[in-house]
Amino acid sequence: MDKDAMITYLIGELKKENLELHDLIIPEELEEKQKLLRALFNTRKPKAASTQFLTIQDLYLQVRKGERGFVQLSSLQPIPQDDRIYLWKGDITRLEVDAIVNAANKTLLGCMKPLHDCVDNAIHTYAGVQLRQACFELILEQGYEEPVGMAKITPAYNLPSAFVIHTVGPKIVDQPTQIDEDLLAKSYLSVLALAEKNNIESIAIPCLSTGDFNFPKQKAAKIAIQTVKTFINESSIIKKVIFNVFDDENLAIYQKLLAE
């Protein structure tokens, strides 16, 4: 089965699951068809999927992983000041490390906005539908939504990493309060503590709360760097931390702060 056939099959199965999609027209062009599939992945509610669906989905996502390319830690350079710390600008879903961190929302179910350009959306897209189901089961077992500053771990499924650690950072309405700053630090600490508990040696962390959650980037970076440095100085497990940024503004902020 080639990629086009896999996409057509997966869209067909997703249409069968949702009566609202009955009249959905599948585009002819491969690129548009691929976008439609991602949008359907994004909006699919957590539920079990058939073995055949998962098999073909996993094959498709492995093809996509090859097309998009993955980045090995050995190809990156640590910062001159500390060989345990890396700064990398790029798509976190391409990193082949022990764990990547997801800037999640309190449901842990991923971003359900079709084709939205956020890390939560990308991670759930390229991990596969298993990730949303796993997160749903964690919250169901917990009995309440994920509190700000806490963290959960799941397999990474079809991502190059082995695990995804999900954390909910504080959401800022105006300016961050001291409580907000403490909660952001707590998110980083919860992530690192969970990584250590699971013997994770290499971990990539995005700029938590600085996207849709509106935490000021400069202040967030200071909190991130200080919290990570303090933790790994006392950890015998975590060997490598990659600060993952997605834009030039955060890249410049981290470069300056890490050089101090």
Pin down the residues of each PLM region:
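Macrodomain-like recognition of ADP-ribose-binding/processing modules
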Residues: 1-260
